[in-house]
Amino acid sequence: MKPFEASKLPIEYSLDKELISLISEANLKYGEYKSNLKNSQFDSRFFLDSIILSESLKSTQIEGTQISQDDMYYLKYMPKTDDNLEIQNLKEVIEYSKNYLKENNKITIKFLNNIHKILLNSVRCNEKEPGKLRNIQNWIGPRGCTIEEAIFVPPVPEDVPILLENLFEYMNNAYIDPLFINLAISHSQFETIHAYRDGNGRLGRALIPIQLALLTEDEPILFLSEVI
Protein backbone atom coordinates (compact mmCIF):
# COMPACT_ATOMS: atom_id res chain seq x y z
CA MET A 1 0.00 0.00 0.00
CA LYS A 2 1.33 3.45 -0.91
CA PRO A 3 1.45 6.43 1.50
CA PHE A 4 -1.68 8.55 1.43
CA GLU A 5 -1.43 11.94 -0.30
CA ALA A 6 -3.35 14.29 1.99
CA SER A 7 -5.12 17.32 0.56
CA LYS A 8 -4.35 20.70 2.07
CA LEU A 9 -7.02 22.63 3.96
CA PRO A 10 -9.54 24.12 3.58
CA ILE A 11 -11.45 21.59 1.52
CA GLU A 12 -14.73 21.83 -0.36
CA TYR A 13 -17.68 19.99 1.15
CA SER A 14 -21.46 19.97 1.07
CA LEU A 15 -23.96 19.56 3.90
CA ASP A 16 -27.34 17.88 3.70
CA LYS A 17 -30.32 19.03 5.74
CA GLU A 18 -29.85 16.34 8.38
CA LEU A 19 -26.23 17.33 9.04
CA ILE A 20 -27.11 21.04 9.13
CA SER A 21 -29.77 20.23 11.72
CA LEU A 22 -27.32 18.20 13.82
CA ILE A 23 -24.70 20.98 13.71
CA SER A 24 -27.30 23.55 14.77
CA GLU A 25 -28.35 21.31 17.65
CA ALA A 26 -24.71 20.83 18.69
CA ASN A 27 -24.16 24.59 18.76
CA LEU A 28 -27.29 25.05 20.85
CA LYS A 29 -26.32 22.34 23.34
CA TYR A 30 -22.78 23.69 23.61
CA GLY A 31 -24.14 27.18 24.34
CA GLU A 32 -26.41 25.77 27.05
CA TYR A 33 -23.50 23.82 28.54
CA LYS A 34 -21.31 26.94 28.70
CA SER A 35 -24.15 28.94 30.23
CA ASN A 36 -24.78 26.30 32.89
CA LEU A 37 -21.10 26.30 33.85
CA LYS A 38 -20.96 30.08 33.99
CA ASN A 39 -24.15 30.47 36.04
CA SER A 40 -23.63 27.50 38.32
CA GLN A 41 -23.92 28.12 42.06
CA PHE A 42 -20.90 25.92 42.75
CA ASP A 43 -17.31 26.39 41.66
CA SER A 44 -17.21 24.89 38.16
CA ARG A 45 -13.46 24.24 38.49
CA PHE A 46 -14.16 21.20 40.66
CA PHE A 47 -16.58 19.87 38.06
CA LEU A 48 -14.10 20.49 35.22
CA ASP A 49 -11.26 18.82 37.14
CA SER A 50 -13.39 15.69 37.40
CA ILE A 51 -14.37 15.91 33.72
CA ILE A 52 -10.72 16.32 32.64
CA LEU A 53 -9.73 13.29 34.70
CA SER A 54 -12.60 11.28 33.23
CA GLU A 55 -11.60 12.36 29.71
CA SER A 56 -8.04 11.23 30.37
CA LEU A 57 -9.35 7.84 31.45
CA LYS A 58 -11.70 7.44 28.46
CA SER A 59 -9.03 8.47 25.95
CA THR A 60 -6.41 6.09 27.31
CA GLN A 61 -8.93 3.23 27.59
CA ILE A 62 -9.31 3.43 23.80
CA GLU A 63 -5.60 2.52 23.67
CA GLY A 64 -6.10 -0.41 26.05
CA THR A 65 -5.37 1.13 29.46
CA GLN A 66 -6.68 -1.08 32.30
CA ILE A 67 -7.79 1.45 34.94
CA SER A 68 -11.36 1.54 36.27
CA GLN A 69 -13.60 4.58 36.77
CA ASP A 70 -13.31 4.14 40.55
CA ASP A 71 -9.51 3.83 40.46
CA MET A 72 -9.00 7.09 38.57
CA TYR A 73 -9.62 9.21 41.69
CA TYR A 74 -6.76 7.49 43.54
CA LEU A 75 -4.09 7.55 40.83
CA LYS A 76 -1.74 9.73 42.89
CA TYR A 77 -1.66 7.05 45.58
CA MET A 78 -1.37 4.03 43.29
CA PRO A 79 1.85 2.40 41.97
CA LYS A 80 3.31 4.27 38.98
CA THR A 81 2.38 1.83 36.24
CA ASP A 82 2.30 2.73 32.55
CA ASP A 83 -1.52 2.76 32.65
CA ASN A 84 -1.50 5.09 35.64
CA LEU A 85 1.06 7.44 34.10
CA GLU A 86 -0.74 7.62 30.74
CA ILE A 87 -3.87 8.98 32.42
CA GLN A 88 -1.93 11.48 34.54
CA ASN A 89 0.09 12.60 31.51
CA LEU A 90 -3.05 13.29 29.48
CA LYS A 91 -4.51 15.30 32.35
CA GLU A 92 -1.24 17.26 32.50
CA VAL A 93 -1.48 17.96 28.74
CA ILE A 94 -4.87 19.64 29.26
CA GLU A 95 -3.59 21.67 32.23
CA TYR A 96 -0.47 22.73 30.32
CA SER A 97 -2.61 23.74 27.35
CA LYS A 98 -4.94 25.83 29.53
CA ASN A 99 -1.97 27.87 30.73
CA TYR A 100 -0.49 28.07 27.22
CA LEU A 101 -3.72 29.48 25.77
CA LYS A 102 -3.80 32.25 28.36
CA GLU A 103 -0.70 33.76 26.74
CA ASN A 104 -0.84 32.46 23.15
CA ASN A 105 -3.48 32.68 20.45
CA LYS A 106 -2.40 29.90 18.12
CA ILE A 107 -1.43 26.25 17.96
CA THR A 108 2.08 25.67 16.59
CA ILE A 109 4.40 22.75 15.88
CA LYS A 110 6.49 23.72 18.92
CA PHE A 111 3.40 23.60 21.14
CA LEU A 112 2.37 20.27 19.61
CA ASN A 113 5.81 18.77 20.22
CA ASN A 114 5.72 19.99 23.83
CA ILE A 115 2.38 18.36 24.63
CA HIS A 116 3.39 15.16 22.80
CA LYS A 117 6.48 15.00 25.01
CA ILE A 118 4.31 15.40 28.12
CA LEU A 119 1.91 12.76 26.85
CA LEU A 120 4.58 10.08 26.43
CA ASN A 121 6.69 11.00 29.45
CA SER A 122 7.95 7.86 31.24
CA VAL A 123 5.47 5.46 29.61
CA ARG A 124 5.78 2.44 27.33
CA CYS A 125 6.13 4.59 24.18
CA ASN A 126 8.95 6.65 25.66
CA GLU A 127 11.53 5.13 23.32
CA LYS A 128 9.63 6.38 20.28
CA GLU A 129 11.07 9.91 20.32
CA PRO A 130 8.43 11.86 22.26
CA GLY A 131 8.24 15.49 21.17
CA LYS A 132 9.78 14.83 17.75
CA LEU A 133 7.98 14.55 14.43
CA ARG A 134 8.48 11.18 12.81
CA ASN A 135 11.26 10.77 10.25
CA ILE A 136 10.21 7.27 9.22
CA GLN A 137 7.22 5.86 7.37
CA ASN A 138 4.56 4.50 9.71
CA TRP A 139 1.38 2.57 8.99
CA ILE A 140 -1.79 1.43 10.74
CA GLY A 141 -2.99 -2.15 10.93
CA PRO A 142 -3.02 -5.30 13.06
CA ARG A 143 -0.04 -5.64 15.39
CA GLY A 144 2.98 -6.99 13.50
CA CYS A 145 1.54 -6.41 10.02
CA THR A 146 3.72 -5.24 7.13
CA ILE A 147 3.10 -2.05 5.17
CA GLU A 148 1.56 -4.17 2.41
CA GLU A 149 -0.95 -5.56 4.94
CA ALA A 150 -1.73 -2.15 6.47
CA ILE A 151 -5.22 -0.70 6.75
CA PHE A 152 -3.88 2.82 6.21
CA VAL A 153 -0.48 4.32 5.37
CA PRO A 154 -0.09 7.99 6.40
CA PRO A 155 1.73 10.57 4.25
CA VAL A 156 5.50 10.31 3.77
CA PRO A 157 7.54 11.84 6.64
CA GLU A 158 8.92 14.60 4.40
CA ASP A 159 5.39 15.99 4.01
CA VAL A 160 4.55 16.01 7.72
CA PRO A 161 5.89 19.52 8.63
CA ILE A 162 4.26 21.07 5.55
CA LEU A 163 0.92 19.41 6.25
CA LEU A 164 1.02 20.42 9.92
CA GLU A 165 1.75 24.07 9.10
CA ASN A 166 -1.23 24.04 6.74
CA LEU A 167 -3.38 22.31 9.36
CA PHE A 168 -2.52 24.89 12.00
CA GLU A 169 -3.37 27.77 9.68
CA TYR A 170 -6.81 26.20 9.41
CA MET A 171 -7.15 25.27 13.09
CA ASN A 172 -6.22 28.76 14.27
CA ASN A 173 -8.77 30.51 12.05
CA ALA A 174 -12.26 30.79 13.51
CA TYR A 175 -13.74 32.23 10.33
CA ILE A 176 -12.96 29.68 7.59
CA ASP A 177 -15.65 27.17 8.55
CA PRO A 178 -18.37 26.85 11.22
CA LEU A 179 -16.96 25.87 14.61
CA PHE A 180 -17.90 22.19 14.80
CA ILE A 181 -17.09 21.58 11.14
CA ASN A 182 -13.66 23.09 11.75
CA LEU A 183 -13.15 20.79 14.73
CA ALA A 184 -14.20 17.68 12.80
CA ILE A 185 -12.06 18.43 9.74
CA SER A 186 -9.07 19.37 11.90
CA HIS A 187 -9.30 16.15 13.89
CA SER A 188 -9.60 14.04 10.75
CA GLN A 189 -6.64 15.77 9.12
CA PHE A 190 -4.44 15.41 12.20
CA GLU A 191 -5.12 11.68 12.43
CA THR A 192 -4.50 11.36 8.69
CA ILE A 193 -1.09 13.04 8.98
CA HIS A 194 -0.16 10.79 11.94
CA ALA A 195 2.76 13.08 12.74
CA TYR A 196 4.47 10.95 15.41
CA ARG A 197 5.71 7.43 15.76
CA ASP A 198 3.20 6.84 18.56
CA GLY A 199 0.57 8.64 20.63
CA ASN A 200 -1.25 10.17 17.66
CA GLY A 201 -4.70 8.98 18.76
CA ARG A 202 -4.44 10.31 22.31
CA LEU A 203 -2.92 13.56 21.11
CA GLY A 204 -5.57 14.01 18.43
CA ARG A 205 -8.37 13.55 20.97
CA ALA A 206 -6.70 16.03 23.34
CA LEU A 207 -6.47 18.62 20.56
CA ILE A 208 -10.26 18.78 20.19
CA PRO A 209 -10.95 20.63 23.50
CA ILE A 210 -7.72 22.59 23.09
CA GLN A 211 -8.71 23.89 19.64
CA LEU A 212 -12.25 24.58 20.81
CA ALA A 213 -10.89 26.63 23.71
CA LEU A 214 -8.66 28.55 21.29
CA LEU A 215 -11.45 29.38 18.83
CA THR A 216 -13.98 30.36 21.51
CA GLU A 217 -11.44 32.13 23.76
CA ASP A 218 -12.48 29.93 26.64
CA GLU A 219 -11.04 27.12 28.76
CA PRO A 220 -11.07 23.52 27.53
CA ILE A 221 -14.52 22.36 28.66
CA LEU A 222 -15.81 19.93 26.02
CA PHE A 223 -14.31 16.43 25.88
CA LEU A 224 -15.40 13.85 23.31
CA SER A 225 -13.25 10.71 23.67
CA GLU A 226 -16.22 8.69 24.90
CA VAL A 227 -18.13 9.26 21.65
CA ILE A 228 -15.34 9.29 19.04
Residue ranges and their predicted role:
Residues M1-I228:
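FIC/Doc superfamily catalytic core
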